[in-house]
């Protein structure tokens, strides 16, 4: 029997070092991981055997067995699943480049509970064996192949792979040589309790040998939890299934267990977590909803089973209408799967709308966790945008609480027909923005958008239920006309523009190409000035984001709006009427101040500093 000694992949070494020197209190998770892996191996073979029945010839009843040998200090876990050949053993146990190990290491928080769950989420669960074992021996024979291979390691940097001539049927056997200090895991009663706690939802029967090692006792019902009636399932069973499936430490916030018996037959058991998932916005995040066909696991990768914006969902979907021998490629553009996806989306959004109305405080917590992802759907062409907007909530500047668009509309002032918003990074800064002072002074609410995605979806959704959605930075906002559209008001507005032409022309001449236009503001009440953009122009924050991403080269010139009721602007205007045009420095300072308030760069910081110093000096002398 030839042996081949190999070094672990560098990233595996880091994981092993973490496991071997683990201080985690919940070391029993090694059993959860090994049972889960064994179940997956059986699921894979069950799927492959649909198109090649010879793979399971003579042994089509899948099972997992667990045995304790106290005398040898061993725990043995055996399955008759897909098995592994030499290449599989090296790829799956010697390297884990596919498992996102670097991301796993970065995500470690030092919180033992959270870190324990990360082990499974990143696919490095096998290595948790080294928390309790000082040597691990894996014997395996791949379905459809004759050769038996053994993988063995003490976890200290190297492993051995060898071919074996021992009699061994299809599947995998893992022998854990338990550390002396962890020998409590050899206690028959304790291990049986651990296995049972992690096996109730597993669809493969799990057998536990008695202390004599002769008789097998089945520990689980081996029926998929989602196939049972809701009345037969306890809340604790739902929780345990959720935690095992998603490697979570929280309880599910919402559980959706439904059987669809219409034109398309399928069962869904879906969960919405109560805590934010660590990889929600990670580029190589995994989907956490598994597709089954007639209780046979098919895939949880590269299938369009749920929309991306609902990626926080956890659970399973089991279809009766898809053929078992369907290829993963065929699932990409499958009409049945598309109908299932639409039905699930409708069901989830319906449940969210119900929760929003019945439990607003709970919903606020959900929104803080997953609202950013949910709003991504508003940028997708295939989304029912109105249905999705119905479950969105935003911070109200007027009431300082989260409200829906429907609640905003219900609070319209007489004659108001527009939904106003202001976007930025910090809600407190937005509240003090001059852009909204006039609207708020008239008790006209403004929604505060602080997620980056907000700047994208408002470009796709310009209205909601017939009401325009408009940024408060737009030049055409007139707080006096927002609630009244009389011709008399329009005439007054035109008269105001003409009256202050001397003022606006002076600002434009002084600032030149720094501004596109200078206008008299219809929305400022106390601030001297603010930047604004026309309806056709890009929102200020959106433009800044695209510049940061190097999508556009430079910022465009903005409009400058002046408040003629402000004392500073009034002084400049009076000076102009007296033919005094010596306020260029003050004009530039007002413009720089408006830029700073919008987060825009000041054109010349040195000149700005000098102007500011000169004005302060004049004030104190």
From Swiss-Prot:
Residues 1-328 are annotated as: A. GO terms for molecular function: ATP binding; ATP hydrolysis activity; ATP-dependent protein folding chaperone; unfolded protein binding. It is found in: Cytoplasm. Residues 545-621 are annotated as: C. Pfam families: HATPase_c_3, HSP90. PROSITE patterns: HSP90. It comes from the Bacteria. PANTHER family: HEAT SHOCK PROTEIN 90 FAMILY MEMBER (PTHR11528). Molecular chaperone. Has ATPase activity. HAMAP family: HSP90. This is Chaperone protein HtpG. It comes from Rickettsia felis (strain ATCC VR-1525 / URRWXCal2).
């Amino acid at each position: 029997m030839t042996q081949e000694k190999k070094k672990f992949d560098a990233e595996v070494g880091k994981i092993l070092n973490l496991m071997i020197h683990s201080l985690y209190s919940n070391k029993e998770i090694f059993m959860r991981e090994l049972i889960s892996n064994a179940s997956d191996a059986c699921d894979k073979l069950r799927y492959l055997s649909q198109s090649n029945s010879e793979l399971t010839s003579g042994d089509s009843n899948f099972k997992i067995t667990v045995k304790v040998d106290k005398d040898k200090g061993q725990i043995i876990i055996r399955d008759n699943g897909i098995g592994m050949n030499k290449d599989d053993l090296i790829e799956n146990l010697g390297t884990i480049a596919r498992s996102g190990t670097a991301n796993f290491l970065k995500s470690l928080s030092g919180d033992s509970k959270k870190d324990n769950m990360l082990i499974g989420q990143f696919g490095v669960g096998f290595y948790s064996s080294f928390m309790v074992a000082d040597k691990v021996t894996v014997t395996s024979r791949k379905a459809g192949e004759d050769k038996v291979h053994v993988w063995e390691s003490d976890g200290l940097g190297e492993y051995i792979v060898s071919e074996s001539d021992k009699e061994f049927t299809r599947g995998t056997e893992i022998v854990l040589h338990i550390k002396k200090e962890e020998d409590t895991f050899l206690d028959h009663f304790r291990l049986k309790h651990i296995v049972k706690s992690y096996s109730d939802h597993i669809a493969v029967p799990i057998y536990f040998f008695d202390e004599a090692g002769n008789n097998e006792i089945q520990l689980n019902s081996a029926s998929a939890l989602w196939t049972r009636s809701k009345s037969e399932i306890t809340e604790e069973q739902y929780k345990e299934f959720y935690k095992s499936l998603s490697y979570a430490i929280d309880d599910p916030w919402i559980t959706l267990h439904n059987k669809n018996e219409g034109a398309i037959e399928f069962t869904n058991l879906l969960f919405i977590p109560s805590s934010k998932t660590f990889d929600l916005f990670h580029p190589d995040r995994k989907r956490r909803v598994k597709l089954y066909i007639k209780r046979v696991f098919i895939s949880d990768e590269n299938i369009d089973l749920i929309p991306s914006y609902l990626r926080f969902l956890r659970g399973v979907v089991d279809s009766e209408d898809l053929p078992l021998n369907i290829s993963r490629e065929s699932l990409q553009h499958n009409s049945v799967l598309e109908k299932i996806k639409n039905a699930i989306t409708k069901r989830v959004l319906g449940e969210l709308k119900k929760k929003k109305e019945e439990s607003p405080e709970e919903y606020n917590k959900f929104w803080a966790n997953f609202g950013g992802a949910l709003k991504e759907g508003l940028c997708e062409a295939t989304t029912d945008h109105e249905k999705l907007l119905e479950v969105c909530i935003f911070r109200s500047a007027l009431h300082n609480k989260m409200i829906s668009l429907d609640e905003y509309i219900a609070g319209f002032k007489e004659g108001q027909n527009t939904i106003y918003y202001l976007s930025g990074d910090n809600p407190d800064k937005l509240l003090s923005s001059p852009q909204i002072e006039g609207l708020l002074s008239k008790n006209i609410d403004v929604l505060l958008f602080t997620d980056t995605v907000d700047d994208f979806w408002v470009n796709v959704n310009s209205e909601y239920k017939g009401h325009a959605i408009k940024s408060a930075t737009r030049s055409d906002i007139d707080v006096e006309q927002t609630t009244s559209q009389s011709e008399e008001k329009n005439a007054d507005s035109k008269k105001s523009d003409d009256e202050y032409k001397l003022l606006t022309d002076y600002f434009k001449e002084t600032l030149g190409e720094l501004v596109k236009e200078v206008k008299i503001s219809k929305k400022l009440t106390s601030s001297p000035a603010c930047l604004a953009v026309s309806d056709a122009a890009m929102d200020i924050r959106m433009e800044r984001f695209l510049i940061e991403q190097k999508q556009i080269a430079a910022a465009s010139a903005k409009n400058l709006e002046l408040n003629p009721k402000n004392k500073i602007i009034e002084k400049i205007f009076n000076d102009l009427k007296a033919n005094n045009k010596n306020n260029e420095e003050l004009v530039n300072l007002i413009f720089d101040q408006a830029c700073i308030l919008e987060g825009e760069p000041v054109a010349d910081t040195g000149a700005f500093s000098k102007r500011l110093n000169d004005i302060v000096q004049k004030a104190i002398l």
